[in-house]
Each structure stands twice: as C-alpha cells, then as structure tokens.
Amino acid sequence: MIQTQSMLDVADNSGARRVMCIKVLGGSHRRYAGIGDIIKVTVKEAIPRGKVKKGQVMTAVVVRTRHGVRRADGSIIRFDGNAAVLLNNKQEPIGTRIFGPVTRELRSEKFMKIVSLAPEVL
C-alpha cells in the first residue's frame, strides 16, 4: 500500500533511483495505491546523464509492494520493497529495461509493454 510521502525504488533504466509518491491518482480522496495503480511521483535520487533529473514530477505505475497482492486462489504475493516504473504522458514506460520481477496483475492493455520487458512475471 503506497500513500503520499511513500518512498519507492525505480525498477527501470530511466535514470531515477528513488522516487517519492506525492499523489495517488484515481478518485478525489483516494488514500492508498497497490500494484498496477498509477501515482504521481517526484524524483528524489537520480544518476548523472539519465533521462530524468532530480526534482522532476512524473507519473509512475506501482509494480511491487511490501503489502503484496491477494490472488483469487487465496495466495498472497509480497515483495521485499516498494518499486515503480516511470511513465511518459502516453502512459508508456520511459526506460527500455525493467529490473526485478513483476506480477500478473499488470497484464492489462495499458501495461503489456512492462510485462514483456520484465525478466520474470509472478
């Protein structure tokens, strides 16, 4: 569960390393975001010569959470940390590589590109 002020790792090669959630999109008083939800983030830590710079405000999709996601069969998939993938204005990933596993819940029309780039889909 990601909320405002939550810090997330970046799971792509866009140049950002850490981002902070500044808004959960979808609803006027929505408090939490889970896997597959879109959030507004600001870049807190970036590498030199990356595609994004520190202080930039971006949109991102949550790909891993410590809270996890419950499947229909009752199983829960949890991760060691929270991670997101940065998106451009057309909701496409900025980076060309995805690091770490992602869940099957991202297999919607919007995020098939992220699933195809990921090394492992759980």
From Swiss-Prot:
Q: Coiled-coil intervals in this record?
A: none
Question: Per its UniProt record, what Pfam families does this chain match?
Answer: Ribosomal_L14
Q: Does the keyword Transmembrane helix apply?
A: no
Gene Ontology molecular function: large ribosomal subunit rRNA binding; structural constituent of ribosome
Superkingdom of the source?
A: Bacteria
Which BP terms from GO are recorded?
Answer: translation
Keyword list (alphabetical) reads:
Ribonucleoprotein, Ribosomal protein, RNA-binding, rRNA-binding
InterPro entries (alphabetical): Ribosomal_uL14, Ribosomal_uL14_bac-type, Ribosomal_uL14_CS, Ribosomal_uL14_sf
Instruction: Report the GO terms under cellular component.
Output: cytosolic large ribosomal subunit
Quote the subunit structure annotation: Part of the 50S ribosomal subunit. Forms a cluster with proteins L3 and L19. In the 70S ribosome, L14 and L19 interact and together make contacts with the 16S rRNA in bridges B5 and B8.
Q: What does this protein do?
A: Binds to 23S rRNA. Forms part of two intersubunit bridges in the 70S ribosome.
Task: Indicate the family of this protein.
Answer: Belongs to the universal ribosomal protein uL14 family.
**Name recorded for this polypeptide:** Large ribosomal subunit protein uL14
Organism lineage: Bacteria, Pseudomonadati, Pseudomonadota, Gammaproteobacteria, Pseudomonadales
